[in-house]
């Protein structure tokens, strides 16, 4: 019983500490937004991958970085409308 409580407590601690880990009420849209933003940050943080994208798109590295940052605003589009509760 204590082992189960400890694991649950550790999970709650991680979820409160890190934004992208989600929680019980995380929607599919929020989860996908976190994944996409994490991917875009990784692309910008790895210099060689950024060079690869710049060559593939025939753009400068600064333009590719700017485009990735623009995509981070709403990577999955606007959130879906929630059904109203009566």
Curated annotation (Swiss-Prot):
Region described as Interaction with SF3B1 and SF3B3: spans on this chain: 15-76
Coiled-coil residue windows: none
Compartment(s): Nucleus
InterPro entries (alphabetical): SF3b5/RDS3-10 (IPR009846), Splicing_factor_3B_subunit_5 (IPR017089)
Entry-annotated residues carrying N6-acetyllysine: 17
A matching Pfam family: SF3b10
Entry keyword tRNA processing: no
Modified residues (Phosphoserine): 9
Residues with N-acetylthreonine modification: 2
Any one Gene Ontology BP term: mRNA splicing, via spliceosome
Primary location recorded for the protein, binned into one broad class: nucleus
Entry keywords, A to Z: Acetylation, mRNA processing, mRNA splicing, Nucleus, Phosphoprotein, RNA-binding, Spliceosome
GO cellular component terms attached to this protein's record: nucleoplasm; nucleus; precatalytic spliceosome; SAGA complex; spliceosomal complex; U12-type spliceosomal complex; U2 snRNP; U2-type precatalytic spliceosome
Domain of life: Eukaryota
Residues under site feature: Interaction with RNA: 5, 20
Function: Component of the 17S U2 SnRNP complex of the spliceosome, a large ribonucleoprotein complex that removes introns from transcribed pre-mRNAs. The 17S U2 SnRNP complex (1) directly participates in early spliceosome assembly and (2) mediates recognition of the intron branch site during pre-mRNA splicing by promoting the selection of the pre-mRNA branch-site adenosine, the nucleophile for the first step of splicing.
Subunit structure: Component of the 17S U2 SnRNP complex, a ribonucleoprotein complex that contains small nuclear RNA (snRNA) U2 and a number of specific proteins. Part of the SF3B subcomplex of the 17S U2 SnRNP complex. SF3B associates with the splicing subcomplex SF3A and a 12S RNA unit to form the U2 small nuclear ribonucleoproteins complex (U2 snRNP). Within the SF3B subcomplex, interacts directly with SF3B1 (via HEAT domain) and SF3B3. Component of the minor spliceosome, which splices U12-type introns.
Family: Belongs to the SF3B5 family.
Protein name, entry field: Splicing factor 3B subunit 5
């Amino acid at each position: 019983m204590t082992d189960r409580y400890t694991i649950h407590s550790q999970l709650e601690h991680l979820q409160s500490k890190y934004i992208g880990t989600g929680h019980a009420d995380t929607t599919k849209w929020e989860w996908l937004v976190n994944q996409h933003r994490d991917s875009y940050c990784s692309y910008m943080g790895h210099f060689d991958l950024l060079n690869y994208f710049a060559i593939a798109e025939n753009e400068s590295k600064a333009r590719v970085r700017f485009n990735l940052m623009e995509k981070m605003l709403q990577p999955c589009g606007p959130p879906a409308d929630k059904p109203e509760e009566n």
